[in-house]
């Protein structure tokens, strides 16, 4: 089982990795081992256009995650439409509400969008962050108690 620290580190790494996923080609490149490639709606191209990144696990080879809202979907069927599945399960995703290409946004528009992406991350992973902080505080408290109990031990000689 992963500790809160491991989950926290993985979460932050995902946030950093996904900052490059505004680019369609970068998202598409993650689908090299995607199980659905032709004669279906959920092709790598359609998945990437809908904002998804391929995030397979050992047990689930078809896990896809939106780089923006971090919604993970698995159990894809050939007739599943990535846009429809995404919008049904993440109605407030900022990527889905874009009306123009990210490259056409003003700097202010892009920064606002990126701020929304980071807010999505913190909403999703706030419990992981809190668990990590609690574990660290517990460990620090234990170390302090051990330190002070060792430094201030009294020995009483009962023979004298």
UniProtKB/Swiss-Prot annotation:
Entry PTM: Ubiquitination is required for centrosome-targeting.
Modified residues (Phosphothreonine): 43
Location in the cell: Cytoplasm; Nucleus; Chromosome, Centromere; Cytoplasm, Cytoskeleton, Spindle
Any one cellular-component term (Gene Ontology): chromosome
Domain notes: C-terminus is required for spindle assembly.
Gene3D superfamilies, A to Z: Inhibitor Of Apoptosis Protein (2mihbC-IAP-1), Chain A (1.10.1170.10)
GO MF term set: metal ion binding; small GTPase binding
Annotated positions binding Zn(2+): 66, 69, 86, 93
Major location (coarse): cytoplasm
Keyword Endoplasmic reticulum part of the UniProt annotation: no
Subunit structure: Component of the CPC at least composed of survivin/birc5, incenp, cdca8/borealin and/or cdca9/dasra-A, and aurkb/aurora-B. Interacts directly with incenp (via N-terminus), and may weakly interact with aurkb (via N-terminus) to stabilize the complex. Interacts with GTP-bound ran in both the S and M phases of the cell cycle. Also found in a complex with ubiquitin-mediated signaling proteins including at least usp9x/xFAM, nploc4/npl4 and ufd1.
GO biological process, alphabetically ordered: chromosome segregation; mitotic cytokinesis; mitotic spindle organization; negative regulation of apoptotic process; negative regulation of DNA-templated transcription; spindle assembly
The protein's role, per its UniProt record: Component of the chromosomal passenger complex (CPC), a complex that acts as a key regulator of mitosis. The CPC complex has essential functions at the centromere in ensuring correct chromosome alignment and segregation and is required for chromatin-induced microtubule stabilization and spindle assembly. Stimulates the mitotic kinase activity of aurkb/aurora-B in the CPC. Does not appear to exhibit anti-apoptotic activity. CPC. Does not appear to exhibit anti-apoptotic activity.
PANTHER family: BACULOVIRAL IAP REPEAT-CONTAINING PROTEIN 5.1, DETERIN
UniProt xrefs under Pfam families: BIR
Keyword Glycosyltransferase: no
Keywords, comma-separated and alphabetical: Cell cycle, Cell division, Centromere, Chromosome, Chromosome partition, Cytoplasm, Cytoskeleton, Metal-binding, Mitosis, Nucleus, Phosphoprotein, Ubl conjugation, Zinc
Family membership noted in the UniProt record: Belongs to the IAP family.
Stated name of the protein: Baculoviral IAP repeat-containing protein 5.1-B
CDD domains according to UniProt: BIR (cd00022)
BIR repeats: 13-83
């Amino acid at each position: 089982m992963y500790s809160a620290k491991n989950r926290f580190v993985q979460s932050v790494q995902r946030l950093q990795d996904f900052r490059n996923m505004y680019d369609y080609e970068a998202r598409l490149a993650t689908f090299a081992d995607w199980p659905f490639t032709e004669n279906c709606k959920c092709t790598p191209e359609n998945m990437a256009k809908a904002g998804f990144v391929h995030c397979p696990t050992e047990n689930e080879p078809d896990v896809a995650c939106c780089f923006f809202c971090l919604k993970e979907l698995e159990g894809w069927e050939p007739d599943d439409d990535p846009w429809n599945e995404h919008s049904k399960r993440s109605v407030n995703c900022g990527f889905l509400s874009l009306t123009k290409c990210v490259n056409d946004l003003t700097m202010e528009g892009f920064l606002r969008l990126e701020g929304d992406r980071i807010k999505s991350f913190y909403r999703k992973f706030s419990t992981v962050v809190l668990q990590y902080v609690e574990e660290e505080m517990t460990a620090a408290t234990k170390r302090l108690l051990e330190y002070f109990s060792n430094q201030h031990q009294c020995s009483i000689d009962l023979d004298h």
